[in-house]
Amino acid sequence: MSLFGFFKNKGSATTATDRLKLILAKERTLNLPYMEEMRKEIIAVIQKYTKSSDIHFKTLDSNQSVETIEVEIILPK
């Protein structure tokens, strides 16, 4: 990849996909009471900008100290 290609605009589909990928990680040892509230707020913001109600949270591979959550958003056509 050349230096000039680095600044080239991505296609809109690629940009949209990148923006919709969201990974949350929390430490299991900390019992954070605001995680569920934060999850609800994230859903509200996503719905505000995408008008989508098809939002799923998935727990990905976790180790003992970190749990990773992926947010999947199905956009309406």
UniProtKB/Swiss-Prot annotation:
Domain of life per record: Bacteria
Keyword tags: Cell cycle, Cell division
Gene Ontology biological process terms from the UniProt entry: cell division; regulation of division septum assembly
Record SUPFAM superfamilies: Cell division protein MinE topological specificity domain (SSF55229)
UniProt xrefs under HAMAP family: MinE
Family, similarity comment: Belongs to the MinE family.
NCBIfam families attached to this UniProt entry: minE, PRK00296.1
Function: Prevents the cell division inhibition by proteins MinC and MinD at internal division sites while permitting inhibition at polar sites. This ensures cell division at the proper site by restricting the formation of a division septum at the midpoint of the long axis of the cell.
Protein name in the entry: Cell division topological specificity factor
